[in-house]
């Protein structure tokens, strides 16, 4: 079942995409068309989604991803993982949009035709000299391969759903009394004191038997893998870097030394030649012999990385984000992640460049032998685990004693609480969540608890509460958050119910 979390914000974005991208659509949409897409049809209750409409929506989603993420995310329209993700997003959006559209039609959110006309007239893509231009309007509809009536219907649907969302978000579903109680909770602060528990001098286990070390090694062999490592060969493809190198040697001499300097005089090929080379490379990269011939024939410069692993990847000539993407997604390997591809992989960057990469050398991950180095590593692991366990048990005992009025162990370890620290619900961290999850202590009592912070162990004392006045801006922000939260809960409930009661059938598939 599709996830429904944060559906309100996602849905509003989805609804905007429906029309905004129809208006902004460009001629290069065809670059994203799926290959090998057989007859595809989705039926949601009585709404049928044709194969053509699915492709169009897929294209819009690709366009949105490229425009929104720019160079932050590497997208490859031929990458199976990328195709799968975009396909699932498109399918989910189509289903929820159709269900909501059917629901809104049942509610009779009628939009006057004048609003539709006004909306279309205001779209900048259809305007010329600050006026609506009919020629531009029909020109863009032609690019979309959509009729004016179809476009008007889509605008009508968009405005109906937008009106429904507006009505939902503007309706106050929460009682004033409930709202005031929530505001009072936000006006409450809590006072705590902390003590750093330093038990570094604690006596640890001194001897661990060889039998215990071997048992740990056998049960945790995955911890002692020497990582798979590989060297990558690559080159960059763009229309400016395919050269014919004319190499000449230049000798420079002086009275003390003789220097030999090699000059690479690189002459660009014509645009037509470059385009032809790139086209051949992109279409023959899975044919290793043809691919190598093109590289050799055109003297394309190949670069090589040093040994790389899953955790150690650095090469000054490759963007770090690209290397991270390559390694984390195992794109140079087959699906089993241990067999390398015997042909190059092409990664399309968002700046119209492409990197062509393949693995030059590869060594599989192997389990290290039970050597002295591994024994030492296991000893440190077991000592550290034992240390943590003992320390935590001691702090638990301190907390138990303090909560029962006994300060004996606390004093023995010479622990002290710091000055008071003040927390409100506006602090956003795990410690704040912990503090506000505790009950308010009775008069004269204190509540003690343990908290880990960056491998350090702290003992906290919750002693009192205080109140402060919220500003008008803060009250407005909280009220808005409460209202949005309630609207989201209601919309999620509506969508979940619509999904559960819907008849959804699929016909066809995507390769």
Curated annotation (Swiss-Prot):
Extracellular topology: which positions?
Answer: 30-511
Residue stretches making up the PpiC domain: 227-281
Q: Which UniProt keywords apply?
A: Cell membrane, Chaperone, Membrane, Transmembrane, Transmembrane helix
Q: Which membrane topology term applies here?
A: Single-pass type II membrane protein
Gene Ontology, cellular component aspect? plasma membrane
Location in the cell: Cell membrane
In Pfam terms, one family for this protein is SurA_N_3
Q: What residue ranges lie in the Cytoplasmic compartment?
A: 1-8
Instruction: Name the residues that span the membrane.
Output: 9-29
What does the record give under GO molecular function? peptidyl-prolyl cis-trans isomerase activity
Q: How does it assemble?
A: Interacts with the Sec translocon. Binds to the lateral gate of SecY. Forms a complex with YfgM.
- Free-text function comment from the UniProt entry: Chaperone that functions as a gatekeeper on the extracellular side of the Sec translocon. Facilitates the translocation of precursor proteins across Sec by interacting with the translocating substrate. Also plays a role in the release of newly synthesized secreted proteins at the extracellular exit site of the Sec translocon.
Q: What family does the Swiss-Prot or TrEMBL record give for this protein?
A: Belongs to the PpiD chaperone family.
In terms of PANTHER family, this protein maps to: PEPTIDYL-PROLYL CIS-TRANS ISOMERASE D, PERIPLASMIC CHAPERONE PPID
The protein's name is Putative chaperone PpiD
Annotated source species: Buchnera aphidicola subsp. Baizongia pistaciae (strain Bp)
Taxonomic classification: Bacteria, Pseudomonadati, Pseudomonadota, Gammaproteobacteria, Enterobacterales
């Amino acid at each position: 079942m599709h996830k429904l979390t944060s559906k309100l914000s996602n849905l509003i974005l989805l609804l905007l995409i429906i029309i905004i991208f129809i208006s902004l659509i460009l001629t290069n949409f065809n670059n994203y068309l799926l290959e090998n897409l057989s007859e595809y049809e989705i039926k949601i209750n009585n709404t049928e989604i044709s194969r053509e409409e699915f492709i169009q929506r897929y294209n819009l989603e690709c366009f949105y991803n490229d425009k929104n993420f720019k160079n932050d995310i590497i997208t490859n329209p031929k990458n199976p993982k990328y195709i799968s993700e975009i396909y699932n997003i498109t399918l989910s959006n189509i289903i929820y949009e159709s269900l909501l559209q059917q629901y809104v039609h049942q509610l009779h959110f009628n939009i006057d035709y004048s609003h539709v006309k006004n909306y279309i007239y205001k779209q900048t893509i259809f305007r010329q000299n600050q006026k609506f231009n009919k020629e531009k309007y029909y020109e863009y509809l032609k690019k979309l391969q959509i009729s004016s009536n179809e476009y008007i219907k889509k605008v009508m649907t968009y405005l109906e759903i937008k009106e429904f969302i507006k009505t939902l978000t503007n309706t106050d579903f929460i009682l004033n009394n409930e709202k005031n109680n929530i505001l009072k909770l936000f006006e409450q602060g809590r006072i705590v004191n902390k003590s750093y528990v330093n038990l570094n001098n604690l006596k640890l286990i001194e001897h661990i038997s060889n039998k215990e070390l071997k048992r740990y090694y056998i049960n945790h062999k995955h911890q002692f893998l020497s990582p798979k490592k590989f060297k990558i060969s690559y080159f960059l493809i763009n229309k400016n870097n395919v050269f014919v190198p004319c190499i000449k040697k230049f000798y420079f001499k002086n009275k003390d030394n003789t220097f030999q300097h090699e000059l690479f005089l690189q002459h660009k090929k014509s645009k037509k030649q470059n385009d032809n080379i790139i086209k051949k490379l992109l279409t023959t990269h899975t044919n290793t012999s043809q691919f190598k011939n093109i590289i050799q024939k055109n003297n394309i410069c190949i670069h090589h990385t040093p040994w790389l692993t899953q955790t150690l990847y650095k090469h000054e000539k490759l963007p770090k984000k690209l290397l991270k993407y390559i390694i984390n997604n195992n794109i140079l390997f087959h699906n089993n992640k241990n067999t390398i591809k015997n042909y190059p992989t092409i990664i399309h960057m968002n700046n119209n460049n492409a990197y062509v990469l393949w693995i030059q050398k590869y060594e599989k991950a192997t389990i290290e032998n039970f050597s002295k180095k591994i024994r030492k590593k296991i000893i440190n692991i077991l000592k550290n685990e034992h240390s943590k366990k003992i320390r935590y048990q001691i702090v638990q005992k301190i907390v138990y004693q303090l909560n029962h009025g006994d300060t004996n162990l606390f004093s023995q370890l010479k622990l002290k609480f710091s000055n008071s620290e003040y927390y409100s619900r506006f602090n956003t961290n795990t410690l704040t969540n912990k503090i506000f999850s505790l009950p308010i202590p009775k008069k004269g009592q204190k509540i003690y608890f343990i908290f880990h912070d960056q491998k350090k162990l702290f003992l906290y004392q919750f002693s009192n509460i205080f109140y402060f006045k919220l500003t008008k801006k803060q009250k407005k922000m909280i009220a808005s958050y409460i209202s949005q939260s309630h609207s989201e809960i209601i919309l999620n409930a509506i969508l979940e119910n619509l999904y559960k009661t819907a008849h959804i059938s699929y016909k066809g598939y995507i390769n």
